[in-house]
């Protein structure tokens, strides 16, 4: 098992992360982020339903979760909260607010992650603004990065309408589109050779203090 940053030689990449984070690391262009409120879904098990100004819906599911002889209610919340920017810090702040609003001592389980549809999309080869009669009619160009060769985004950051992204990213449609995309990508890269060398992208940043890298050559022992 290896940890840390690695470079893998490949013909193409399908980024299946929720917010296209791999595409971001590669420098894929995106639409400008617009700060504002958006909806987040979060599910808890065992708690009593909560009320808060940020909660716009609290739906108790018809089927509880049963463990042995015990039965636990399942509540799916929809929150309306502001997202300051596209950083993980802002998303973590939203998640903490939601967890604080819904937790009580009776909770036995909860969602690992928030479910939401990012407003920001990649710049694709060709945006799609329609409503397909079949998932097969979805053009793969809307999932392919415009400025990074052979990079596809299998997630809600594809350049499709946000309402459509919410439908596409449900488990069953997402699995089907993943298979369809895999077939498409395999055909397109069939005759492309694997790169002879791995290239690690270096981010260009500006900072006031870059710090210093050093090494301890002597060790002082402290006796207590």
Language model features by range: what are they?
Residues 1-12, 16-221:
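Flavin (FAD/FMN)-binding glycine-rich loop and adjacent Rossmann-like elements that form
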Residues 224:
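Calmodulin-binding IQ motif helices
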């Amino acid at each position: 098992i290896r940890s840390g940053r690695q470079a893998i030689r490949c013909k193409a990449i399908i980024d299946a992360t929720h917010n296209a984070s791999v595409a971001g690391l590669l420098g894929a262009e995106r639409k400008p982020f617009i700060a504002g409120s958006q909806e987040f879904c979060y599910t808890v098990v065992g708690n009593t339903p909560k009320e808060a100004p940020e909660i716009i819906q609290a739906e108790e599911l018809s089927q509880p979760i049963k463990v042995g002889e015990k039965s636990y209610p399942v509540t799916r919340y929809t929150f309306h909260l502001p997202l300051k920017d596209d950083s993980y810090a802002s998303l973590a702040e939203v998640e903490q607010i939601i967890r604080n609003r819904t937790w009580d001592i009776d909770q036995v389980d909860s969602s690992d992650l928030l479910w939401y549809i990012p407003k920001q999309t990649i710049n694709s080869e060709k945006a799609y603004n329609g409503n397909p009669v079949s998932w097969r009619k979805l053009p793969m160009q809307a999932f392919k990065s415009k400025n990074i060769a052979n990079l596809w985004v299998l997630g809600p950051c594809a350049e499709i309408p946000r309402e459509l992204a919410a439908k596409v990213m449900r488990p069953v449609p997402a699995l089907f589109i993943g298979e369809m995309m895999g077939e498409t990508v395999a055909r397109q890269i069939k005759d492309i050779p694997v790169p002879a060398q791995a290239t690690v992208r270096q981010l260009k940043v500006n900072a006031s203090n870059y710090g210093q890298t050093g090494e301890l050559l002597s060790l002082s022992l402290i006796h207590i």
